Amino acid sequence: MVCTTLYTVCAILFILFIYILLFRKMFHLITDTLIVILILSNCVEWSQGQMFTDDIYYNGNVETIINSTDPFNVESLCIYFPNAVVGSQGPGKSDGHLNDGNYAQTIATLFETKGFPKGSIILKTYTQTSDFINSVEMTCSYNIVIIPDSPNDSESIEQIAEWILNVWRCDDMNLEIYTYEQIGINNLWAAFGSDCDISVCPLDTTSNGIGCSPASTETYEVVSNDTQLALINVVDNVRHRIQMNTAQCKLKNCIKGEARLNTALIRISTSSSFDNSLSPLNNGQTTRSFKINAKKWWTIFYTIIDYINTIVQAMTPRHRAIYPEGWMLRYA
């Protein structure tokens, strides 16, 4: 009788032990699963709050994506143009400038007739093209940069177009301590300032000059002269001594990244050799670079407004913002 009772108690304890063991394992398994699901769901929500994974497609309006964690206005069109074209106010002006004190409101209202939301058009002026390297950050859904074109400025126009239409990662260069080399075709030096006179001396593996004397700057080869902006290319994988006036010009070591697909360039030309294939009136090309042949700035803006669909459809709207230290003109 005692043995039977003992066996019964042992059996009950064994069953209880197995039950508790399995229950605790299941409890921990369920708890761990819920914790993992909670963490993953929060990560997904955070990533969606920081990055737009789907591009916005233009169908006549700038589409709206609301995102409280993103500092940029994602339903905007920024237009950059020279400050010099804003003229003195008054009727009967024939200089071709924007002489209307309410020009910004007028232009924005005309864009609204094309389907843009009220308040989505932002007009910004710049003083000189080198501002786009030094200070201007393009942060709208779409960005249009208007630059006057002339044969005398053809080189700088080509270089600013290369800069504006791509993303660049840059670091300051200390010319008093280091020699520098470019490591590939996407590695260039960006010079900007009031007067960038730059000369270089390539060095061999023993630090002797190749065709120049490192100790004599008069023997250096001139790569930039009397310019406000220059993208300097030298022979890759060769160290160079660099000579320039650091008080009037700054130099950055830059790597070209991806194309800035939400940005287009419009060159204003009065040249008789105008290339009509780039005109928005002729649908333009898919390079996000256009030309308008006009002298009057109201004519220029009227043309941009009328053909904004052609211009915008060549672009892709902003879908993410990158903030790593050293990036100039962050991809917006």
Curated annotation (Swiss-Prot):
Task: List, alphabetically, the InterPro entries matched.
Answer: VP7, VP7_1, VP7_2
Which Pfam families did the record assign? VP7
Q: Where does the source fall among the domains of life?
A: Viruses
> What does the UniProt entry say about where the protein is found?
Virion; Host endoplasmic reticulum lumen
Task: Give a short account of its post-translational modification.
Answer: N-glycosylated. Intramolecular disulfide bonds.
* Signal peptide (from-to): 1-49
**The keyword Glycoprotein is annotated on this UniProt entry:** yes
Protein keywords? Calcium, Capsid protein, Disulfide bond, Glycoprotein, Host endoplasmic reticulum, Host-virus interaction, Metal-binding, Outer capsid protein, Signal, T=13 icosahedral capsid protein, Virion
Question: Record's GO cellular component, any one?
Answer: host cell endoplasmic reticulum lumen
Give the primary localization class.
virion
A single GO molecular-function term is: metal ion binding
Complexes and interactors: Homotrimer; disulfide-linked. 2 Ca(2+) ions bound at each subunit interface in the trimer hold the trimer together. Interacts with the intermediate capsid protein VP6. Interacts with the outer capsid protein VP5*.
Primary role: Calcium-binding protein that interacts with rotavirus cell receptors once the initial attachment by VP4 has been achieved. Rotavirus attachment and entry into the host cell probably involves multiple sequential contacts between the outer capsid proteins VP4 and VP7, and the cell receptors. Following entry into the host cell, low intracellular or intravesicular Ca(2+) concentration probably causes the calcium-stabilized VP7 trimers to dissociate from the virion. This step is probably necessary for the membrane-disrupting entry step and the release of VP4, which is locked onto the virion by VP7.
Q: What's this protein's family per the entry?
A: Belongs to the rotavirus VP7 family.
Q: Can you say what this protein is called?
A: Outer capsid glycoprotein VP7
Organism, scientific name: Rotavirus C (isolate RVC/Human/United Kingdom/Bristol/1989) (RV-C)
